[in-house]
């Protein structure tokens, strides 16, 4: 009995020790895990769910919503593509897809600045930042060239020319980014994350040139005789102007703000992540949505008659939908022509059409009915102004007092 009770006590002690060990390990894991994240989440992705660093969750939500809207716009444009018949609206569809692809890349790159950096993440950041912005700015520059042609001449460049120009302009930034990575990482064998903020900004000078040229060319899209395309130019100008403001703000904060606020590198990643999300939404709201809306609008009916244009003959629709020209409502009245008036005077007995000279020895004859009929013949307008009745001369009128 004594041995059995001793064994039970030992078993209870072992179970109590195991329970305390489990509770202690769980408490230590909870203490090391950020609030809002799971236990099995890698430390690299803690910023995506850490409630103590709320900026990551906010920027993540904004970027995710922007990515969904961009995908929806691409799907709408793809579905409605067979119904776009107008040549000037169908030619830039490829450019629109390219621009939406670059905007989607900006929203996706935002997550690379939220998670913790390593060698791979830093290389992706340094390469894709300049390339994606170069793609978007190149598409905006090609669009500015197209709208300027449409406003001035009424016809734009072909679709392959727009896409080719955008890709060629983007290729320059690809070469710059590759050279920067090769010279600093491969040749000098430095870590990919070991770079100064000034070096990062200097590698983006070409993007700044594209943005400034786009802003300058967008100003000329507001001048031209084809006014139906000026609204596209206005939205393009707004997009370029807001992009300039965003770039000035983030470069000021990235280069000087963190130093002045004595934050070190703590705010570098939030600054760049917010810049990507804000730029993506500017591109979507002020360029992608207006352009796609304009592209999907039905074409104008060029053969529709303008009933308010008096310089054109009026048209009416017959039962067979044939256009028949009608006479003008303001036809010239020829009843008062001088030839008919002189003929009427000769008929009344006045030689050579002279009203004031009578032949000697004769009082002449009273003007006959043809004379009175030739004096005045009302026009259609006179009938309308007279209330629909034809004005006639009184019975005692002799026809002598014509004016």
Swiss-Prot record:
UniProt keyword Cell membrane, yes or no: yes
Alphabetically ordered keywords of this record: Cell membrane, Cytoplasmic vesicle, Disease variant, G-protein coupled receptor, Glycoprotein, Membrane, Phosphoprotein, Receptor, Signal, Transducer, Transmembrane, Transmembrane helix
Keyword Phosphoprotein: yes
A Pfam family hit: 7tm_3
Domain of life: Eukaryota
Glycosylation sites per record: 30
InterPro entries hit by this protein: GPCR_3_C, RA-inducible_GPCR3
Signal peptide: 1-28
Subcellular location: Cell membrane; Cytoplasmic vesicle membrane
Sequence ranges on the Cytoplasmic membrane side: 78-94, 148-162, 221-234, 293-403
Transmembrane parts of this sequence: 57-77, 95-115, 127-147, 163-183, 200-220, 235-255, 272-292
Task performed by this protein: G-protein coupled receptor involved in the regulation of cell volume.
Protein name: G-protein coupled receptor family C group 5 member B
Organism of derivation: Homo sapiens
